[in-house]
């Protein structure tokens, strides 16, 4: 009997070892959830067991054909497969030490970010036009494909473009700089143009389905807020806009948690025209208000320097000190500023 228990325990550990990373939703079928219900979950945009485990019960009940009793059972089974309880700070520290950072292409900028853009969290870059937001995004779309020992993420990139500023030629120039095959680099970037705020959110459901199929290291949304400025106007629609934006950012955070991808979003700025603006040296602030401020893990403020030089400042971060770094925009992507 003891021997049999030992064998079962070994089998369990081997299953656990195999299920490194997100688990496909089909795993729930082995736990007694009917194939029909699993199909309904998949159609509603749940492609992994983690997505189900992290979802509030209300969200599952809203799916046609899922009753409250079924939702309880599904959540109970998902919770068995996904560790969601307390853990010691030691274990968490160990997990944090395994987080990969993706190089930005500039040594100074990487030093400021203590290694590069962090995976598994949201990094927001905001600034005026011509401050290098889109150029950093293009460079990251290539560097995330590099091997880990070269500062990459060994994965594909996903690019959601809402402003029509994506240029594959820029990717080819960066690929040449790193000695990568141009055609392979372009094949590894999934591109989508977002046309309105609902479409932008819909693209994230497709993104989650694609992330189950193959390994992605980076998700870029450039810009996350541009369409919100045009789809919603005036104070009357402000609360509806913020609720929609909060839902979009929540989905981004869920993708970062589920798949461990680095999420990079760009944001626009608005000039402050109130009385306080007279007393601030730089009267610009990022749009999206507190909702976007709380959703982003790291916020970077970009501004122009002399010539091709740009300055990046850590505006808000849980662990990076408030400091600045200079970088340059070159023909082959983002690099270090020349003295």
Swiss-Prot record:
As annotated, the Glycyl lysine isopeptide (Lys-Gly) (interchain with G-Cter in ubiquitin) covalent link is placed at: 58, 64
Instruction: List residues, modification Phosphothreonine.
Output: 13, 309
An example GO BP is: double-strand break repair via homologous recombination
Q: Which SMART domains match?
A: AAA
Q: Where is the HhH domain?
A: 48-77
In its record, the post-translational modification comment is: Ubiquitinated by the SCF(FBH1) E3 ubiquitin ligase complex, regulating RAD51 subcellular location and preventing its association with DNA. Ubiquitinated by RFWD3 in response to DNA damage: ubiquitination leads to degradation by the proteasome, promoting homologous recombination.
Positions carrying Phosphoserine: 14
What is this protein for, i.e. what is its function?
Answer: Plays an important role in homologous strand exchange, a key step in DNA repair through homologous recombination (HR). Binds to single-stranded DNA in an ATP-dependent manner to form nucleoprotein filaments which are essential for the homology search and strand exchange. Catalyzes the recognition of homology and strand exchange between homologous DNA partners to form a joint molecule between a processed DNA break and the repair template. Recruited to resolve stalled replication forks during replication stress.
* Similarity comment: Belongs to the RecA family. RAD51 subfamily.
Q: What is this protein called?
A: DNA repair protein RAD51 homolog 1
């Amino acid at each position: 009997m003891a021997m049999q228990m030992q064998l079962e325990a070994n089998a369990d550990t081997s299953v656990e070892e195999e299920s490194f990373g997100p688990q496909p939703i089909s795993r729930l079928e082995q736990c007694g959830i009917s194939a029909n219900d699993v199909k309904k979950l998949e159609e509603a945009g749940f492609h992994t067991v983690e997505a189900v485990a992290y979802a509030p019960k209300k969200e599952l009940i809203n799916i046609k054909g899922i009753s409250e009793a079924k939702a309880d059972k599904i959540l109970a089974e998902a919770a068995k497969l996904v560790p969601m309880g307390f853990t010691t700070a030691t274990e968490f520290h160990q997990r944090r030490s395994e987080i990969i950072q993706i190089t930005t292409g500039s040594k100074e900028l990487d030093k400021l970010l203590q290694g590069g853009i962090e995976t598994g969290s949201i990094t927001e870059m905001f600034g005026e036009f011509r401050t290098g937001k889109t150029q950093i995004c293009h460079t990251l779309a290539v560097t995330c494909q590099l091997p880990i020992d070269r500062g990459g993420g060994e994965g594909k990139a996903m690019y959601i473009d809402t402003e029509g500023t994506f240029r594959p030629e820029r990717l080819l120039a960066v690929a040449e700089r790193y000695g990568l095959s141009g055609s392979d680099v372009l094949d590894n970037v999934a591109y989508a143009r977002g046309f309105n705020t609902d479409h932008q959110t819909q693209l994230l459901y497709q993104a989650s389905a694609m992330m189950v199929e193959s390994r992605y290291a980076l998700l870029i949304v450039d810009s996350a807020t541009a369409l919100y400025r045009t789809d919603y106007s005036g104070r009357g629609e402000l609360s509806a806009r913020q609720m929609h934006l909060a839902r979009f950012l929540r989905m981004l955070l869920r993708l970062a948690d589920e798949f461990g991808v680095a999420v990079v979003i760009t944001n626009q700025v608005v000039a402050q025209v109130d009385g306080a603006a007279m007393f601030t040296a730089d009267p610009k602030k990022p749009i999206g208000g507190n909702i976007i401020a709380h959703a982003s893990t790291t916020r970077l403020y970009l501004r122009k320097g002399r010539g091709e030089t740009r300055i990046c400042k850590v505006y808000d971060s849980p662990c990076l000190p408030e400091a600045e770094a200079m970088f340059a925009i070159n023909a082959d992507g983002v690099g270090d500023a020349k003295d």
